């Protein structure tokens, strides 16, 4: 998700969404699992949408760490929702609190890494940010 968040910040929503879709497609090709693609693509799309909204419209409230946490939590929620629908079992939502806790930690570190990368991109490739 580092690459997705950096793509959203540097290039915008459409490119972030393309990177998300590409990430899910590569996962499917590597694992050979269509079911992993289904879970991944729904998580990636919701995560990308939520990160964009948080970054674009709530950047005074949320830092990139907060934006990343929103993305991680959204990704987990989407995957659990799809699993619940596919398996026709709402008990799967009982995993959500644990996954949300993990999402807080992973989102925090993804946000930190994204801040570092964007700071270095701005320093070394300032012309990208001048458009």
Task: Tell me what each language-model feature is.
Residues 22-53, 64, 87-91, 96:
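Interfacial aromatic-anchored transmembrane helix boundaries in multi-pass membrane proteins
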């Amino acid at each position: 998700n580092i690459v997705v968040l950096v793509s959203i910040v540097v290039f915008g929503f459409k490119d972030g969404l393309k990177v998300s879709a590409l990430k899910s497609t590569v996962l499917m090709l590597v694992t050979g699992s269509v079911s992993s693609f289904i879970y991944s693509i729904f998580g990636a799309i919701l995560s990308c949408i939520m990160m964009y909204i948080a970054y674009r419209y709530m950047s005074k409230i949320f830092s990139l760490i907060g934006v990343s946490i929103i993305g991680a939590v959204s990704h987990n929620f989407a995957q659990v929702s799809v699993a619940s629908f596919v398996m026709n079992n709402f008990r799967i939502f009982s995993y959500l609190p644990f996954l949300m806790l993990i999402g807080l930690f992973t989102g925090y570190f993804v946000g930190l890494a994204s801040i570092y990368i964007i700071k270095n991109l701005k320093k070394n490739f300032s012309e990208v940010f001048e458009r």
